[in-house]
Amino acid sequence: MTTLAIDIGGTKLAAALIGADGQIRDRRELPTPASQTPEALRDALSALVSPLQVHAQRVAIASTGIIRDGSLLALNPHNLGGLLHFPLVKTLEQLTDLPTIAINDAQAAAWAEYQALEGDITEMVFITVSTGVGGGVVSGGKLLTGPGGLAGHIGHTLADPHGPVCGCGRTGCVEAIASGRGIAAAAQGELAGANAKTIFTHAGQGDEQAQQLIHRSARTLARLIADIKATTDCQCVVVGGSVGLAEGYLALVETYLAQEPAAFHVDLLAAHYRHDAGLLGAALLALGEKL
């Protein structure tokens, strides 16, 4: 059976066909619409899936935000151009006439990355550092989603009570500091208005401010990981996302984590499936998990 997997992120929309063998075929992408209207997202999704849906028997969606009763509820609306609510499952069933499931993108990615781990691991946490900061928790070999879909939204835990206001409404969230959007928002002077990718490029060229912004992000993430270790006693933490997988970033996080007391150390791994983890995880969950 072939699954049409869809990944809805703050920067891009991706879709692919995934067979029962887990192989990804016909992957395609579109920019996430910047408009605040549900119609803009619906139109973009229609354009994305229309060439693929005839080859699939079901749809599995991995999306940023809280997924509750098949709908997307944005915890940080800025990550989707201000969109607060979107009926994901209903919309895709109407567009494709196929049975559809939906799950948070980081939760889906966590499940895919868990399948790739070697050894006897039952406790794992996945963190994605990209436009925002998200996560997924596997405990006892099972993915935690929570009754309201909030489980794993670790980017909205407190990093600095005097830090910037986050799009979720809290002050000083990890996401407001460590994410690509947070890195860019803190840039000043010649870097003001630059995106995270540009800031990483400047850091590689020796720009002191760019390097400080990236170190600030990595230090914040390391402290989050120490908190996660204290909370879950996980056996490993897998890091993904465009910032998390940027050259040199994970090594910086490891350096800052090593400065924490030994009890809070944990093995850090780069995401195995990289940018395809959300797609694959959603398809795997459609195969055998009740959401």
Swiss-Prot record:
It catalyses: an N-acyl-D-mannosamine + ATP = an N-acyl-D-mannosamine 6-phosphate + ADP + H(+). One of its GO terms (biological process) is N-acetylneuraminate catabolic process. Keywords: ATP-binding, Carbohydrate metabolism, Kinase, Metal-binding, Nucleotide-binding, Transferase, Zinc. HAMAP family: ManNAc_kinase. PANTHER family: N-ACETYLMANNOSAMINE KINASE, ROK (REPRESSOR, ORF, KINASE) FAMILY. Catalyzes the phosphorylation of N-acetylmannosamine (ManNAc) to ManNAc-6-P. This is N-acetylmannosamine kinase. The gene is nanK.
